[in-house]
């Protein structure tokens, strides 16, 4: 399975509008962070290839152009906040070109929020609207021949979804991982986890909290995402443990193909 970081930034992105700090002004492309999202490419046991988005970020059009994305076979949503869903309208072109409805997967409150925000896409079937199907889950499910495990975690007071697919897991916008969820994530080979700031934040792990969770979960390797402009990429890399890295936009990882 191929994992592409479409974006590694927070809701403001980096550079931040109006900010002239050294990170926002940095010429290093690794310090330029679109909103956090992933593209997963896998081939199931039947040889069927799939391109799956994790969240439809506010920057999805730009992200799709960067990686020459020509098809979307599904979307896994972590939660319903603006930086994770407002790019949904960019799915229109994929439905038009391929003549398909794209399945969306998320918790019930996430799907309800999407239906409300994009009600024009569901109240009629007029030309020019996204062609999508809403799907909720209450446990693991099969997505195009692959076993997907949604894992409940906390984003301040709301429950959102992390995901484990084979030996890869994605945990962003998280402030706490309940014990039962930690057991589901334990021993994962590749963990992507959010680390918004250096200081504590009510809705997101800080750097130290993310590092604590990486150790708690006994992840083989970990990649930090949802990084604010407090972090300069090269400096952050130098202070991290050997098995932990700062992700950046365009980074591609390879994981074992997930099984059904």
Question: Locations of the language-model features?
Answer:
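Cap/insert and terminal regions of metallo-dependent hydrolase folds
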Residues: 176-257
């Amino acid at each position: 399975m191929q994992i592409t970081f479409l974006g590694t930034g927070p809701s403001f992105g980096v550079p931040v509008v109006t900010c002239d700090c050294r990170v926002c002004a940095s010429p290093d492309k690794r310090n330029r962070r679109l909103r956090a999202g992933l593209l997963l490419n896998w081939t199931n046991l039947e040889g069927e290839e799939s391109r799956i988005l994790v969240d439809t970020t506010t920057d999805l059009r730009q992200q799709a152009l960067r990686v020459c994305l020509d098809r979307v076979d599904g979307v896994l949503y972590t939660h319903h906040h603006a930086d994770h869903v407002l790019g949904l309208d960019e799915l229109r072109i994929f439905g038009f070109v391929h003549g398909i409805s794209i399945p969306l997967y998320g918790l019930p409150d996430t799907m309800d929020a999407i239906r409300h925000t994009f009600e024009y896409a569901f109240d009629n079937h007029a030309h020019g609207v996204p062609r999508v199907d809403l799907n909720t889950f209450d446990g693991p499910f099969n997505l195009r021949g692959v076993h997907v495990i949604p894992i409940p975690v906390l984003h301040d007071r709301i429950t959102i979804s992390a995901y484990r697919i084979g030996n890869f897991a994605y945990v962003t916008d998280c402030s706490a991982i309940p014990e039962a969820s930690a057991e589901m994530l334990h021993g994962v080979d590749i963990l992507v986890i959010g680390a918004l700031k250096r200081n504590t934040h009510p809705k997101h792990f800080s750097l130290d909290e993310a590092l604590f969770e990486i150790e708690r979960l006994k992840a083989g390797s970990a990649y930090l995402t949802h990084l604010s402009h407090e972090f300069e990429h090269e400096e952050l890399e130098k202070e991290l443990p050997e098995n932990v890295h700062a992700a950046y936009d365009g980074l591609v990882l390879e994981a074992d193909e997930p099984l059904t």
